[in-house]
Amino acid sequence: VQAAASTLVLLSSMINAWHTGQWDITQLTYPISCLLLTAAIGMKLGLVPFHFWFPEVLQGSSLTTALLLSTMMKFPPITILFMTSHSLNPMLLTSMAIASTALGGWMGLNQTQVRKILAFSSISHLGWMAIIIIYSPKLTLLTFYLYSLMTSTVFLSLNTIKVMKLSTMMT
């Protein structure tokens, strides 16, 4: 998934260069390039409909690895999202953001595995960030930093007390 998303980022830049002569990814103006870049960032962040890989990967990894995937591995795509926010397709980004916020919250309610709950929480939070970036890119960065801090605290606490399921948390 990540390799395909990286390929889409490069493809969007190449298509933009063919049509406009501009290779700078922060200066995309060709509509197809903007659409591809928006989809690629959605894939990298795990936004709906490109979210299917994220809960399964988090569930299959240790809490420490899941922490890194939920926070540190989101820094590069969030940076690209911030730098290219003016070039992204607003309709596609808004659609993915609203769907991520709704589906992340809804699917998280149906889980008993802690890592899957946190994965769907991450999808929902990233949906909120994708909505915010349209109006205030700097506020999105602040939101992401706070999300990373809170998520790190939760993952490290769960790792310390060795919780894997909600049922073991109550005992």
Model-derived features: where do they sit?
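Core, highly hydrophobic multi-pass alpha-helical transmembrane subunits of bioenergetic inner membranes
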Residues: V1-T171
